[in-house]
UniProtKB/Swiss-Prot annotation:
The keyword Zinc is annotated on this UniProt entry: yes
Protein known as: Penicillin-insensitive murein endopeptidase
GO CC terms: outer membrane-bounded periplasmic space
S-S pairs: 44-265, 187-235, 216-223
Family membership noted in the UniProt record: Belongs to the peptidase M74 family.
Organism of provenance: Shigella sonnei (strain Ss046)
Length: 274
């Protein structure tokens, strides 16, 4: 798919996510065994876990938004990754949005993050823990140059390379979305150990954070996985195509209507939202 078409799809998905959503009305996880249902951009979750706010290895940003819920596998991944980072003396992991208590569509900012299997992680590792004020209004560190063609060399750190690599090497991770310029720098720095690069996918924005996505849990029978990324390290023509100028669109994007919910998610809404 060419980049013009992908950009249009991204815009449409973002527009759909801005529509009013009833999922915010569910303020606690739905009781039951953990089940991720549907697709990453059209689904929900039963039995979500709450990521503990207090941890010596990570800090949770924007807790007032209450987007720190996810499948137990996601909570364990965050704890596993942040422990590895801490043991290597790299700094504190900054956790952004996961999902809402029952997953589902956000009213803005995300098209995915609906099944409790996605998390945003800042691409900075402070040596000194952030204050409560900093966590509530975090300052993102834009690692990408203005022209979008490379990272800012003074901001790019070996620890950020290692953070992304550690996440990609995790057995439960299927994709990590970063800006194309960040993917390009990873390709340059990777050396001969390159298998993990397959999971790192270029995507629009993502200049200051990585978006980590886990595979569907084996016992979540209604969860819809994505196809695996193409074979190879993704550092060749596919990556370079992201730096080609977009062709002007010939039509205005139409407002996209969100697709019907999976039946189990609709039933969940019918039961828990008046």
């Amino acid at each position: 798919m060419n980049k013009t078409a992908i950009a249009l799809l991204a815009l449409l998905a973002s527009s759909a996510s801005l529509a009013a959503t009833p999922w915010q009305k569910i303020t606690q996880p739905v009781p039951g065994s953990a089940q991720s249902i549907g697709s990453f951009s059209n689904g929900c979750i039963v039995g979500a876990d709450t990521l503990p706010i207090q941890s010596e290895h990570y800090q949770v940003m924007r807790t007032d938004q209450r987007r720190y819920f996810g499948h137990p596998d996601l909570v364990m991944f965050i704890q596993r990754l942040s422990s590895q980072v801490s043991n290597l003396g790299m700094g504190t992991v900054l956790i952004g949005d996961m999902g809402m208590p029952a997953g589902g569509r956000f009213n803005g900012g995300h098209a995915s993050h609906q099944t409790g299997l996605d998390v945003d992680i800042f691409l900075q590792l402070p040596k000194t823990r952030w204050t409560s004020a900093q966590l509530l209004r975090p300052q993102a560190l834009d690692l990408v140059s203005r022209d979008g063609k490379h990272v800012v060399s003074t901001l790019w750190k070996p620890e950020i390379f290692s953070l992304i690599k550690l996440a990609a090497q995790d057995k439960d991770v299927t994709r990590i979305f970063v800006n194309p310029a960040i993917k390009q720098q990873l390709c340059l720095d990777a050396g001969t150990d390159r298998d993990w690069l397959r999971k790192v996918r270029p995507w629009f924005q993502h200049r200051a954070h990585m978006h980590v996505r886990l595979r569907c849990p084996a016992d979540s029978l209604e969860c819809e996985d994505q196809p695996l990324p193409p074979s190879g390290d993704g550092c060749g023509a596919e990556l370079q195509s992201w730096f080609a100028p977009l062709k002007p669109g010939t039509t205005k994007p139409e407002k996209k209507t969100p697709p019907p919910l999976p039946p189990s998610c609709q039933a969940l809404l019918d039961e828990h939202v008046i």
